[in-house]
């Protein structure tokens, strides 16, 4: 239980209870993780404002677009302030402004001592955000290390394409 409270997982296609409203869902997740009423209210307000989701929280999730569902899922992953966040393709469905905000949140989380593992096919995002990187081919780790160790003087895309050709 302790480990679960320290982690969050954001799948590439999160299952969100469509019969709930956004605020009901976030309160449900906060209840699961024991987030106090005061902390949850503050965090929901902060993240919903940042993602411009506040006006939509009273609406049923069934009416949300893919992008709104993704924003809600991101907030639900952050609501209990986990130390480790695992994300699978977190930028899919986000508009450019929300994607930029997520990048900022990821950097803030790491700067505050947290860690994030995420998968992406957008190598420029990995190159800009990551301190360490791993390249996986057909389920096997083929290269890993700091960004400098992996890419040297090349771009991450060039390294990836070279490794794919092997």
Describe the role of every protein-language-model region:
Residues 27, 31, 39-56:
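Conserved ABC ATPase "signature" region
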Residues 85-89:
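Catalytic Walker B motif of ABC-type/P-loop ATPase nucleotide-binding domains
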Residues 126-128:
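A short, surface-exposed alpha-helical micro-motif characterized by mixed small hydrophobic
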Residues 144-145:
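ABC ATPase "signature
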């Amino acid at each position: 239980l302790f480990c679960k409270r320290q982690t969050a997982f954001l799948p590439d296609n999160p299952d969100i209870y469509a019969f709930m409203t956004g605020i009901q869902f976030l309160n449900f997740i906060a209840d699961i993780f024991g987030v106090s009423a005061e902390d949850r209210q503050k965090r929901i307000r902060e993240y919903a404002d940042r993602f411009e989701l506040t006006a939509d929280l009273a609406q049923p999730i069934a009416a949300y677009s893919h992008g709104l569902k993704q924003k809600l899922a991101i907030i639900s992953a952050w609501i209990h302030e986990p130390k480790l966040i695992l994300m699978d393709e977190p930028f899919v469905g986000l508009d450019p402004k929300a994607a930029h905000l997520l990048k900022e949140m990821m950097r803030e989380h790491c700067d505050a001592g947290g860690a994030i593992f995420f998968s992406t096919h957008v190598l420029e995002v990995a190159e800009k955000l990551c301190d360490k990187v791993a390249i996986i081919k057909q389920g096997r780790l083929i290269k890993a290390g700091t960004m400098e160790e992996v890419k040297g003087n090349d771009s991450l895309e060039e390294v990836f394409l070279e490794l794919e050709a092997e």
